[in-house]
Regions:
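Flexible, glycine/threonine- and acidic-rich loop/arm segments that mediate assembly and lattice contacts
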Residues: 1-114, 123-154, 164-174, 178-181, ...
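Glycine-rich, aromatic-lined ligand/substrate-binding cores of catalytic
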Residues: 197
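Short acidic-hydrophobic, aromatic-tinged amphipathic segments that line or gate anion-handling sites
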Residues: 161
Length: 325
């Protein structure tokens, strides 16, 4: 208001935003029979199992994070959540190019694109970028002053993590009749000849058109690349009452030992709330984490979406890129 000695000052209050987080519990057991120990020259397989526990847990936690990201990008409960999915997803018509990453991060976060620091991609995508000399290998200097290249690389200054567990889905893309490998779409009641495919068989379809007979598609693989920034996903080791324990059954299979492992973790994507709309037990499965109905953009909590205030989606350094290589 105008401070003129006669205008009343109007007070306003801040809204409180709410974020739901979820604890994910997982368990695993490994067993070794006494007989295996006896017939292998006293080889203790349980020692080998113990050495693999951390690696196994890392793999399970990675699956959990990928399921969470899938769920985040499947949000559809309100307009603002859908806007996040749209603005933070870039669909490349073909393989990655030199400008793909910069364009995608700018689309997602605008001036905040500088927050992005990690790129998770499939090896096929990484290979394509390497062939374009877009991946720069990190270097280190040893104690003798010799500079060597590391296996780790960076793209536009962002660390690249290569993992073939990233989604790579076979499906169909839009094409022209002249496109190499293109097939013609025919009606479902037609008998396809060479170079043709029934409309109902074009699945999954990655194009953006309303498919109909006499159109053309081309089979291919759609790769999903995730770009994350500092603080994109918060992590907390919640712990279990008994994380590790050994059990012995002297009768089963002539005697056997079992190593039990339990753990509970919390992965919370910044600016995204877990709502537990569809969850059968106290710990969500990866399928439930991947369900977009369980996620929503953080907001002020009003029952009606029209009355809510939402976090600015540009503050969330999470982006997704679809490409064909």
């Amino acid at each position: 208001v105008n401070y003129d000695g006669q205008t009343d000052i109007t007070a306003t209050s801040l809204k409180t935003f709410e974020q739901g987080v979820v604890v994910v519990g997982r368990a695993k057991a490994w067993v070794e029979r006494d007989f295996s120990y006896d017939i292998t020259g006293k080889q203790d397989f349980m020692d080998a199992v113990a050495a693999q526990v951390a690696e196994y847990k890392d793999g399970i936690d990675q699956d959990t994070i990928l399921a969470i990201l899938k769920g985040v990008f499947a949000m559809n409960s309100d307009a603002k959540s859908k806007e996040f999915v749209s603005k933070h997803t870039s669909d490349v018509d073909g393989a990655m190019t030199a400008t793909t990453l910069n364009t995608a991060t700018n689309k997602a976060c605008g001036a905040n694109k500088k927050k992005f620091s990690l790129v998770f991609m499939h090896s096929d995508v990484s290979t394509g970028l390497e062939n374009l000399n877009l991946i720069e290998r990190l270097k280190y200097t040893d104690k003798d002053g010799i500079t060597r290249s590391l296996d780790l690389g960076s793209w536009n200054g962002k660390l690249v993590v290569v993992d073939d567990d990233l989604p790579a889905e076979e499906g169909y893309f839009d094409a022209a009749e002249s496109t190499e490998g293109a097939v013609k779409v025919v009606a479902n009641d037609a008998t396809p000849s060479a170079g043709e495919i029934k409309l109902s068989a074009v699945t999954p379809y990655f194009g953006g058109k309303m498919l109909a007979a006499n159109m053309y598609v081309v089979p291919g693989i759609r790769y999903t690349t995730y770009v994350l920034g500092d603080g994109a996903v918060s992590y907390e080791d919640i712990g279990a009452k008994v994380p590790y324990e050994m059990g012995r059954d002297p009768a089963k299979n002539g005697g056997q030992d079992t190593l039990y492992n339990r753990w509970r973790d919390c992965f919370a994507p910044f600016g995204i709330s877990y709502e537990k709309v569809s969850q059968a037990s106290l710990s969500p499965t990866d399928t439930e984490l991947a369900d977009g109905a369980n996620w929503v953009l953080v907001h002020s909590g009003e029952a009606q979406a029209a009355k809510r205030s939402y976090i600015n989606h540009k503050a969330i350094p999470i982006a997704r890129i679809f490409s064909r290589g």
